[in-house]
């Protein structure tokens, strides 16, 4: 299986048909140490990411062959997406369907579990981040009276609280590689998803 040359994602299709190749041919890996991440991770979370059909923001620079290799090594695959997309169908693993547009609530609930159970790198946060205490106050409900628990997010996302807790605990205890897709509302984001739109 190779990346879809007739992808609905504008850049990839255009590059393949205009230049005869995509930027992936002969390009370096701009997303850091992809090889190192894949060699050392125990779990990959594909969050709104379908690199088998469209590269999007995260650009799928590790490629189909590397994803297959990670699967053969026994790396657990988790897919968070409203749809059982091509990548999740191809690689298998756990699919967590989330209602469209509700990912922030899911992220807040995962963060709640990490903070509540101490499943984050406290030294890294203390040395390399700013604003953590204010954000923590919001997540824990100290700011607005609504703790962002897995139970809190369930009516909005449709993801059962026990699934969120299990994911957060596993993610917090394993070396996890986040393969996030799309670009949100930034460059190309609106058109680089199956349900996106062209704005120009």
Residue ranges and their predicted role:
Residues 61-74:
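Catalytic-core regions built around general acid/base machinery
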Residues 71-78, 83-174:
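Long, well-ordered, tryptophan-enriched scaffold segments
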